[in-house]
Amino acid sequence: MRPPISKSWPAPAKLNLFLHVTGQRDDGYHELQTLFQFIDHCDYLDFQVNLCGEIKLHSELSKVVADKDNLILQAAKSLQKHAGVTQGADIWLEKLLPMGGGLGGGSSDAATTLVALNALWNINYHVDILAEIGLKLGADVPVFIHGLASFAEGVGEQLKPVLPAEKWYLVLVPNVHVSTQAIFQSPELTRNTPKLSLSNLMSQHWSNDCEKLVIAHYPQVANALSWLVEYAPSRMTGTGACVFGEFEQEQQALAVLAELPPNMTGFVAKGMNRSPLLERLANA
């Protein structure tokens, strides 16, 4: 008899509250300084362990299941191989986060897969080992594994937990996909922002070095940002396309959401310095 399905493992979105590109390494990767904070909008994953060793992904989104490079499958297979386990898993994905919007949904799904199967397969790796496995899948997978709002340096893998204000955000989702690779390969990208200490960064005006380039080439992002900035301090997350405005109160964000033009989509979310994944793990 198979084990029961372990349900509702959250994979939260993240915002880059600031993002500075401070250099480029010889291997082509970029040096960053950024601040990650989670928001309370999540994908959800269910897991059922099997004894045959097969890893299978189920989703209502056929293109997710058909993608053999899907990060969920990569994460599960990487952990299975690293730990030498013979068990497999059926994985069900409820995809609620926009894809390719700079909210980290794919990386978060991978992180939740590693954290959940580490528990369900009784591997019990330390979180740092999971983060090492996750880093090979993507630079921002480790922050989702650790589950704490963090200041990040290097390519984004050197993490220091911080406690920024947990504000309310109105997140707009422009109907366009921005290629992260294209942005970081562009000769127009600012790559020489001076490195600053964490204390200086936390006290200054926050910005995103990728924003100027993206809004120059993607009018949908430019239009969303120019509309939102009329109501609140606003900027882009990651390499876009999503942009966010920050508010002190939920009601303020909801009031602006109600004014949203019919050609734009968005949602209101709460900033979280502790990922809901940690609470789910505690109840595994």
Curated annotation (Swiss-Prot):
Gene source species = Shewanella denitrificans (strain OS217 / ATCC BAA-1090 / DSM 15013)
Q: Which gene encodes it?
A: ispE
Q: Which PANTHER family match?
A: 4-DIPHOSPHOCYTIDYL-2-C-METHYL-D-ERYTHRITOL KINASE, CHLOROPLASTIC
Q: In which pathway does it act?
A: Isoprenoid biosynthesis; isopentenyl diphosphate biosynthesis via DXP pathway; isopentenyl diphosphate from 1-deoxy-D-xylulose 5-phosphate: step 3/6
* Catalyzed chemical reaction(s): 4-CDP-2-C-methyl-D-erythritol + ATP = 4-CDP-2-C-methyl-D-erythritol 2-phosphate + ADP + H(+)
Q: What class of enzyme is it?
A: transferase
**Gene3D superfamilies with a match to the protein in the record:** 3.30.230.10, GHMP kinase, C-terminal domain
> Could you identify this protein by its name?
4-diphosphocytidyl-2-C-methyl-D-erythritol kinase
Is Transferase one of the keywords UniProt gives this record?
yes
Query: What is one process in the GO biological process aspect for this record?
Result: isopentenyl diphosphate biosynthetic process, methylerythritol 4-phosphate pathway
Q: Which domain of life is it from?
A: Bacteria
Write out the function statement from the record: Catalyzes the phosphorylation of the position 2 hydroxy group of 4-diphosphocytidyl-2C-methyl-D-erythritol.
NCBIfam families from the entry? Answer: ispE
